[in-house]
């Protein structure tokens, strides 16, 4: 296991590949990585430049078909996505790169015992699922290293989206955005949530308008204020499915194009940023 604190901020990087919600579809995830020339079919890191960063926007698990008429496509249980991205991060680090897997609302749901989107193949039984995902459980060593929010240069990444209200809550307690990652790490390692952290945990992480759940981001004026406070130009989010990657209010990129076969799509997209140029890439199933 890679033993490091959760890193919030990275320097500007010449190449960042951004992949939306995966929901257990390890095959399509690999297809994107191969299409982007991040790995080859032998899972070797071939990215150029070598220090390329891959950001996966969360929701690696919960692979139940959203349309029950879809054929069963799942070969491996959804947790294999967590293990694979953990392995890939180790491979990337050995070559100078990095794979950042964000925490999404579906990872959180599983840690609190909500398995309503888990496929029959992945569920196996409730007890085993609980032992995997519970705080201090089997997966906690991996999940405790994964951030809820990351900044790379002037780019902000989180699963559903940060708002000015979230920053105001943090400011009330003299905390910066990186503290959200600290609270998550304490929670998943089964450390007590401090009394002064309770509002941050409940309103920013657990709440339906929190950064893992919201579908109602700030209007443009407040969005710009929020980004300026963090020294950012763009925010990248997953969570809300869109037919194609799109830019909203000039500052928010929506990246979740329903990649997983659980959504029944025959094409999907990812983002490849190279030398500050944001490129939207199409993949046909």
Q: In which residue ranges do the predicted regions lie?
A:
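Feature recognizes metal-dependent phosphohydrolase scaffolds
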Residues: 1-285
């Amino acid at each position: 296991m890679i033993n490091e604190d959760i890193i919030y901020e990275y320097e500007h990087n010449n190449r960042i590949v951004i992949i939306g919600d995966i929901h257990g579809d390890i095959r399509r995830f690999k297809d994107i990585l191969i299409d982007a020339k991040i790995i080859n079919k032998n899972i070797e890191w071939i990215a150029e430049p070598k220090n390329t960063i891959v950001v996966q926007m969360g929701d690696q698990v919960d692979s139940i078909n959203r349309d029950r008429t879809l054929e069963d496509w799942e070969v491996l249980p959804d947790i294999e996505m967590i293990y694979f991205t953990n392995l890939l991060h180790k491979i990337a680090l050995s070559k100078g790169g990095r794979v950042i897997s964000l925490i999404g609302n579906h990872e959180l749901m599983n840690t609190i015992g909500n398995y309503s989107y888990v496929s029959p193949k992945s569920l196996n039984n409730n007890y085993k699922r609980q032992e995997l995902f519970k705080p201090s459980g089997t997966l906690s060593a991996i999940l405790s290293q994964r951030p809820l929010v990351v900044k790379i240069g002037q780019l902000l990444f989180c699963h559903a989206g940060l708002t000015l209200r979230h920053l105001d809550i943090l400011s009330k307690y003299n905390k910066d955005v990186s503290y959200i990652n600290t609270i998550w790490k304490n929670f998943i390692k089964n450390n007590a949530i401090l009394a002064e952290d309770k509002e941050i945990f409940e309103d920013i992480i657990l709440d339906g308008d929190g950064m893992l759940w919201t579908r109602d981001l700030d209007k443009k004026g407040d969005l710009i204020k929020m980004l300026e406070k963090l020294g950012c130009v763009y925010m990248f989010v997953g969570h809300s499915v869109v037919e194609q990657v799109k830019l909203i209010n000039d500052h928010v990129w929506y990246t979740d194009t329903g990649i997983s076969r659980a959504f029944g799509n025959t094409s999907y997209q990812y983002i490849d940023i190279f030398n500050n140029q944001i490129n939207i890439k199409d993949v046909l199933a």
